[in-house]
């Protein structure tokens, strides 16, 4: 089912509000051609062709016995595969399929590298799929991971049976995210000597609190504080992430659309998938649906886990 007016009307009622539906209806009517498809300019792929070194990603594989392509989970910026442990186990129980979770380059237990772009992260994912002899999969990516999933689908569509982009669209992300401030605050954290882990976390949180006001975000960032050789450090590559932050907020340009099923699953309380993004979603992913989960913000899978799992399972089983 494509992004048609009837689908969008059903989505808007009770979620983003009737005023958004009216706005989109007017926009669609003025932008669509006679056959109901949006008239959009095609881009180029010049930014996606440069070579880069592929990183051997760290992964966890949750075994399942049911047939069907495995589910591959991709985390967001400052996240790691451990964010999806409970989600992965639940998906194995509900679908019976294998579930693979990955640490992106410069995150978690994966190696660091000087390049942090979506084509590079796409190449990393393709390599691990090849290494594990996975010829087709269902990609599920949150935020940065969602843009990585889109890039893999657009570059290597035969590898992706379908995909889910969680609370992110193929549009440039407005830098209202606070990520530049988070990076700067993390870089300023200083922990002296060999101290207990509990003390290190407390001191780091105190230093972050002047910039990162939300306690939940501080706790999320602190999952990256690790001990190495008796001292504490950030396991994410802050320097490279900072250098490539604009690459991560942007999205590469593509000409050819992805022909398979896609789901853009947003939080109803989050601004990251809006009506302004629908034309580009329609252009690149003509078989996409857009759904919103009530009461969820950007971290949809954490805010409304039950609803998130139901949406994922319904989409996976809709083949």
Swiss-Prot record:
It catalyses: 1-octadecanoyl-2-(5Z,8Z,11Z,14Z-eicosatetraenoyl)-sn-glycerol + H2O = 2-(5Z,8Z,11Z,14Z-eicosatetraenoyl)-glycerol + octadecanoate + H(+); a 1,2-diacyl-sn-glycerol + H2O = a 2-acylglycerol + a fatty acid + H(+); a 1,3-diacyl-sn-glycerol + H2O = a 1-acyl-sn-glycerol + a fatty acid + H(+); 1-octadecanoyl-2-(9Z-octadecenoyl)-sn-glycerol + H2O = 2-(9Z-octadecenoyl)-glycerol + octadecanoate + H(+). Phosphorylated. Pfam families: Abhydrolase_1. Residues 69-304 form the AB hydrolase-1 domain. Transmembrane segments: none annotated. Its EC number is 3.1.1.116. It is an enzyme of class 3 (hydrolase). The keyword Transit peptide applies. GO terms for cellular component: mitochondrial matrix; mitochondrion; oxoglutarate dehydrogenase complex. InterPro entries: AB_hydrolase_1, AB_hydrolase_fold. Keywords: Hydrolase, Mitochondrion, Transit peptide. It is found in: Mitochondrion; Mitochondrion matrix. Its main location: mitochondrion. Residues 1-28 form a transit peptide. One of its GO terms (molecular function) is lipase activity. It comes from the Eukaryota. The active site is at 143 (charge relay system), 239 (charge relay system), 298 (charge relay system). Belongs to the AB hydrolase superfamily. PANTHER family: PROTEIN ABHD11. Catalyzes the hydrolysis of diacylglycerol in vitro and may function as a key regulator in lipid metabolism, namely by regulating the intracellular levels of diacylglycerol. 1,2-diacyl-sn-glycerols are the preferred substrate over 1,3-diacyl-sn-glycerols. The enzyme hydrolyzes stearate in preference to palmitate from the sn-1 position of 1,2-diacyl-sn-glycerols. This is sn-1-specific diacylglycerol lipase ABHD11. It comes from Xenopus tropicalis.
